[in-house]
């Protein structure tokens, strides 16, 4: 009886498809700065523009309410922030789409790979949430002491907290607002602005400071209530958590874990501010 040889197929190196290039990585961004497709205008407009768009969305809401009641009230629009915030998201996505197109990339390239095998990004996001969320709580407590001189946080019932919305507004706030808001916010500051300022400034510390400032300031404007103490309180309350949450971007460039960390924060925010 002749012997039979068992042949094991060997994968050719040529058959293994290489990983797609990271078009949002520092080397790729540096090259686009060199050839002139990336400059200061895009990152600057997007970084500042999100706050401007949030204020504009509140102004539009105030205008709609004025048409309904014939009584102008900026603060009356404030309680709708988990509804009109999506208008700012749409504007922000449009801005980023325009500027990324000039760079020759897509919006999707800002997100990077999403690793869901064995729930990798989900669990990493949960870990980040548990690590960072206490800094927002400590920030709020410290800001209350600094601004108001007591342990009692400010109350703007019906505006920033204890908000009363119709049923459809409540459903939208709990179902769609946070699903859109969190990834758009992450794309704006972490996916688009931060790596570009890191390259343009040639200084990580400066890039962190610049993006952290505007990312924190965004929370002052959602909603924007004309009270200087509240403005200062909200800025100081969010600053520590924003800085801590931005630092992992020095190592982790993918947005997946951060979106999974951000979603529960925004859901908690809806629960804490809506009167059910």
Regions found by a protein language model. Name each.
Residues 39-46, 77-85, 89, 120-125, ...:
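Residue-level signature of transmembrane alpha-helical entry/exit and packing/kink sites
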Residues 55, 118-124, 130, 195, ...:
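Residues in flexible loops and secondary-structure boundaries
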Residues 134-137, 155-158, 163-276:
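Transmembrane helix-loop-helix hairpins at the membrane interface
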